[in-house]
């Protein structure tokens, strides 16, 4: 059976064992690396902008094929299916490399801050892209900025990506989200018109 750990972002200690670590998550990481990821997952708060930035950086190094990633079991572009991960480990005897999550995160943050911060003010919004225009105008006005966007970056959904949550299940687990709930909420029509 899986170990029970505190919920993502709860800030609780090890005594607050409320949710299991999925087997496919445990198989993806060296035990020491997993312990560090669990500590970060528990104590970083998604509603704090600094912690959210750090969580984003951590999600970016969660899995990939080079030494800068915490797990090498899958590419960094998407997560292999959970069942595939379990089958792959059983079939190949895959042993995850020991990585220091804190060192890897520090290196990632160093790469992110290699260039100076932009001098132009901006905003970031979280929500449905179909209502982004109205929300962006209001947020820009609230910050004393002109109420028209000059650049919009959205993610997800991507057209023709059918199951965004499913293909990012390891990252959604890290952030405390349910991949199936994300897929149920996203537009399955994959048409440009609603946007």
Label the predicted regions.
Residues 32-154, 159-162:
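SAM-dependent nucleic-acid methyltransferase catalytic core
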Residues 1-4, 104-112, 168-170:
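Charged, low-complexity, helix-prone segments enriched in Lys/Glu/Asp/Gln
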Residues 1-46, 177-189:
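Conserved phosphoryl-transfer catalytic core
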Residues 135-151, 157-195:
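SAM-dependent methyltransferase catalytic-core segment centered on the flexible catalytic loop
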């Amino acid at each position: 059976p899986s170990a029970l750990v505190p919920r993502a972002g709860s800030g609780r200690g090890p005594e607050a064992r409320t949710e299991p670590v999925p087997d496919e998550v445990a198989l993806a990481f060296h035990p020491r690396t997993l312990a560090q990821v669990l500590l970060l997952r528990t104590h970083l708060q998604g509603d704090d902008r600094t912690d959210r930035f750090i969580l984003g950086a951590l999600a970016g190094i969660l899995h990939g094929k080079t030494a800068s990633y915490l797990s090498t079991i899958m590419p960094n572009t998407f997560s292999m299916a959970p069942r595939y991960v379990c089958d792959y480990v059983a079939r190949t005897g895959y042993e995850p490399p020991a990585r220091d999550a804190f060192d890897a995160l520090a290196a990632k943050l160093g790469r992110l801050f290699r260039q100076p911060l932009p001098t132009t003010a901006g905003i970031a919004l979280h929500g449905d892209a179909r209502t982004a225009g109205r929300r962006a105008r209001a947020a820009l006005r609230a910050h004393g900025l002109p109420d028209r966007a000059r650049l919009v970056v959205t993610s997800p959904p991507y057209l023709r990506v059918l199951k965004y949550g499913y293909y990012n299940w390891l990252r959604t687990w890290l952030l405390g989200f349910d991949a199936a709930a994300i897929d149920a909420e996203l537009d399955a029509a994959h048409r440009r018109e609603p946007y």
